[in-house]
Structure formats: structure tokens, C-alpha cells
Amino acid sequence: MTLQEQIMKALHVQPVIDPKAEIRKRVDFLKDYVKKTGAKGFVLGISGGQDSTLAGRLAQLAVEEIRNEGGNATFIAVRLPYKVQKDEDDAQLALQFIQADQSVAFDIASTVDAFSNQYENLLGESLTDFNKGNVKARIRMVTQYAIGGQNGLLVIGTDHAAEAVTGFFTKFGDGGADLLPLTGLTKRQGRALLQELGADERLYLKMPTADLLDEKPGQADETELGITYDQLDDYLEGKAVPTDVAEKIEKRYTVSEHKRQVPASMFDDWWK
């Protein structure tokens, strides 16, 4: 088995999917898991990007089905901007599409800036822009878990195969979640699910960005990765990609393994 095949297997990627069937399986997963845990529903941060839009709509479909079947579940969608988000219109469009039971907005700027200032005062140096970006992601995680803990809700994560293979998420930030309904999907497969669900194409054709950096607001994921999502998707779906691209992907996969594991102990061997 080639490394490419090993990665596809580890990340549960199927080269070809039926979007309608995938929606059904993932909604069922959300329903089954929330019932098993005894939780009262879900909470998820909504950015206006493809991934949170898809996960949010799946979550809302799941809780509606639970209620229609005589159960009780709710979904809270959370906007978590840092000051003014340039693509706020997209976030609002996503919320209109998702139709969450409840929506709430938290501007994380005061919390992030207070921490950043305290860090500088105590340690005598400013946070790097990259590290501050990770703080933003982790404050968003803290906010979602506070809402979840207060209301008995599970925190949904938006990680999918194209992010997982590169480790392109903040450890204990957007990587901190209770369940991952998009696992195994490539970026283009996620788009196909949104198309099947009837989303406005603006929500899945827009340039993906983590938008964590003050110095480079709205920087494209592909710019930061040095790899396009089409290349990542081709690789994950078992297609041939240029050798240098495959090497970049495989290197990122190897060095980011710790992000896909629980914290290491001396009894684990995945890190050796």
C-alpha cells in the first residue's frame, strides 16, 4: 500500500461519493451521537465559509428530525468575529441558509486583546501575529464550550480530509470539538453536499481563508499552504498529482500527526 493509499484509508476518504447519501449518513451520525451522549443538541461557530455552513446546516437538519420524531434537541449557531469581519455579509447569508434554532454573536476582540496586552506586560514581548491568530481560534473554542456547557450542547468541529491531511487547524482551537460530521470529505465533496442542499453558490465558491492574521487579513488558505485545494482533493481521491505536490502533502501529513492524536504519553507509539 502506498503512502497515498494509507492516508486515504486513515482519513476515510472515498474517491467518489453520492452527495445525497452522504448527507443522510452524516445527519444520522449527528442524531445517533447526540442521543447516545444524552446531550441536548449542538453548538457551532459560523464564519460564513463552506465548512461551517455545511456543518451548521447538517446540525439543524439533525435537530429538526429529532424533534419531528418526538425527541428534544436544539442547535445554536455562534458568530465569533474579531472586530469587523470583512465578509460579514457571507456570514449572514450562511445563517440565513442554515436557519439555526438560535443565533448569537460574540465579538472576541476584547478578550483576545486583553490577553495579548497581559502577555506583553508580563513577559516583555508581543505575541507574534501567528501566535495571536491561534489565540483567536482558542478563544472561539472556549466560547463555544461555555455555551455548550451552559446548555448541555455538543461542540461541532468542521475538520474535513483536506484540512486533516495538512494539519491546517489550530490545535485545541478549531481542532477542539466533540464530534466531526465532515470527516472523510474532500473540499470539492463538501461543495457537492452544499449544492445538493441548495446553498447559494457564493457560500461554496468563495476563497477559503482561516482569517486569523492581523497582518494578512483574509489571506487565502492556499497561499499559506502553498498547495491548492484541487491538488489536495486530487491526492486524497487517489488521483495522480505532481511529485513535488505529493511530497509537500506527505510532509505536512507526517509533521502534523500530533494534531490528529490525543496528547502523547510514554505508552503511545504513534510518535516514535
UniProtKB/Swiss-Prot annotation:
* Assigned EC number: 6.3.1.5
Superkingdom assignment: Bacteria
**Residues that hold ATP according to the record:** 45-52, 158, 187, 209
This protein's species is: Bacillus cereus (strain AH187)
Give a yes or no for keyword NADP in this entry: no
Q: Which UniProt keywords apply?
A: ATP-binding, Ligase, Magnesium, Metal-binding, NAD, Nucleotide-binding
Q: Which GO terms describe its cellular component?
A: cytoplasm
The annotated subunit structure for this chain is: Homodimer.
| Residues the record lists as binding deamido-NAD(+) | 138, 171, 178, 258-259
The biological process GO terms on file are: NAD biosynthetic process
Q: Which residues bind Mg(2+)?
A: 51, 163
- What InterPro entries does this protein's entry cite? NAD/GMP_synthase, NAD_synthase, NH(3)-dep_NAD(+)_synth, Rossmann-like_a/b/a_fold
Function description: Catalyzes the ATP-dependent amidation of deamido-NAD to form NAD. Uses ammonia as a nitrogen source.
The entry lists its GO molecular-function terms as: ATP binding; glutaminase activity; metal ion binding; NAD+ synthase (glutamine-hydrolyzing) activity; NAD+ synthase activity
- Name of this chain's protein: NH(3)-dependent NAD(+) synthetase
The reaction(s) annotated as catalysed by this protein in its Swiss-Prot or TrEMBL entry are:
deamido-NAD(+) + NH4(+) + ATP = AMP + diphosphate + NAD(+) + H(+)
Tell me its family. Answer: Belongs to the NAD synthetase family.
**Biological or metabolic pathway of the protein:** Cofactor biosynthesis; NAD(+) biosynthesis; NAD(+) from deamido-NAD(+) (ammonia route): step 1/1
